[in-house]
């Protein structure tokens, strides 16, 4: 492990400017551009993937819906959910997309194990599950060998908006969160710190280096 991944902790950020910044970063990066991980939360929003079907949006109500360029179907983001955007040069790493997804899932499973939560991945539905309930969602886009979008881990949030959709296109999919599964207290900042460490280790980086500056500098 020799590479360094830069980490931006962006706080609560509207979805649209974050998505636009991901597109800019991915479009402008060169062969030597270091990889980055963005950790943040979003105000309430539904995002619909490229293959998203309208029938999976049951009754969005007053929550905005954004059509985006990631894989997968509709999902929900809201405060108390930890979102991680993985801006990686997948081609440079020599990692296949399936391997990338597996390593992200392993990062989440190991993080949850640290809270005595037994979680697993499913071959038929990307993401991480506790029993039959989904606790983390994945959705990536690869463009010219570079990834963007990423993961969303339910930490301590209002899960009710998930009832307005078929999460990730699965009718009746039950959602859960770390707060409801962990045996002890859950601090959002600590979960964020553990996630960055797990992702760096599982993806083969020697160091996760904090970057200053928000997306307006990108």
From Swiss-Prot:
A Pfam family it matches: LplA-B_cat
Which organism is this protein's natural source?
Azotobacter vinelandii (strain DJ / ATCC BAA-1303)
- Recite the UniProt keywords alphabetically: Acyltransferase, Cytoplasm, Transferase
Q: Record's CDD domains?
A: LipB
- Catalytic residues (positions): 168
Q: What are the disulphide bonds in this sequence?
A: none
Residues covered by the BPL/LPL catalytic domain: 31-207
Q: Write the signal peptide boundaries.
A: none
The entry lists its GO molecular-function terms as:
lipoyl(octanoyl) transferase activity
Query: Which reactions are catalysed by this chain?
Result: octanoyl-[ACP] + L-lysyl-[protein] = N(6)-octanoyl-L-lysyl-[protein] + holo-[ACP] + H(+)
Question: What is the enzyme's main class?
Answer: transferase
**What is the annotated role of this protein in its UniProt record?**
Catalyzes the transfer of endogenously produced octanoic acid from octanoyl-acyl-carrier-protein onto the lipoyl domains of lipoate-dependent enzymes. Lipoyl-ACP can also act as a substrate although octanoyl-ACP is likely to be the physiological substrate.
- In which compartments does the protein localize? Cytoplasm
Q: Give, as in the UniProt entry, the pathway in which the protein acts.
A: Protein modification; protein lipoylation via endogenous pathway; protein N(6)-(lipoyl)lysine from octanoyl-[acyl-carrier-protein]: step 1/2
What is the protein name for this chain? Octanoyltransferase
First-listed, main subcellular location of the protein, grouped into a coarse class:
cytoplasm
Q: Which InterPro entries match?
A: aa-tRNA-synth_II/BPL/LPL, BPL_LPL_catalytic, Octanoyltransferase, Octanoyltransferase_CS
**NCBIfam families, alphabetized:** lipB, PRK14342.1
Residues binding substrate, per UniProt:
70-77, 137-139, 150-152
- Other observations noted: In the reaction, the free carboxyl group of octanoic acid is attached via an amide linkage to the epsilon-amino group of a specific lysine residue of lipoyl domains of lipoate-dependent enzymes.
EC annotation? 2.3.1.181
- Which family is it part of? Belongs to the LipB family.
Q: Which SUPFAM superfamilies match?
A: Class II aaRS and biotin synthetases
| PROSITE patterns named among the record's database cross-references | BPL_LPL_CATALYTIC, LIPB
Q: Show which residues form the site (Lowers pKa of active site Cys).
A: 134
């Amino acid at each position: 492990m020799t590479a360094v991944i830069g980490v931006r902790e962006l706080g609560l950020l509207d979805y649209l400017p974050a998505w636009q910044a991901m597109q800019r970063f991915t479009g402008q990066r060169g062969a030597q551009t270091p990889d980055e991980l963005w950790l943040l939360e979003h105000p309430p929003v539904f995002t619909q993937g490229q293959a998203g079907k309208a029938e999976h949006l049951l009754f969005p109500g007053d929550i905005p819906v954004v059509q985006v360029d990631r894989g997968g179907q509709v999902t929900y983001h809201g405060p108390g959910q930890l979102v991680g955007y993985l801006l990686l040069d997948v081609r440079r790493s020599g990692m296949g997309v399936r391997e990338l997804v597996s390593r992200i899932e392993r990062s989440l499973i190991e993080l949850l194990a640290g809270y005595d939560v037994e979680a697993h991945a499913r071959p038929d539905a990307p993401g991480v599950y506790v029993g039959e309930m989904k606790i983390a969602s994945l959705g990536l886009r690869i463009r010219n060998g570079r990834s963007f979008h990423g993961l969303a881990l339910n930490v301590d949030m209002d899960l009710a908006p998930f009832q307005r959709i078929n999460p990730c296109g699965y009718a009746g999919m039950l959602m859960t969160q770390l707060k409801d599964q962990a045996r002890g207290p859950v601090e959002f900042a600590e979960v964020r710190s553990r996630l960055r460490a797990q992702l760096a280790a599982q993806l083969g980086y020697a160091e996760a280096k904090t970057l200053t500056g928000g997306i307006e500098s990108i």
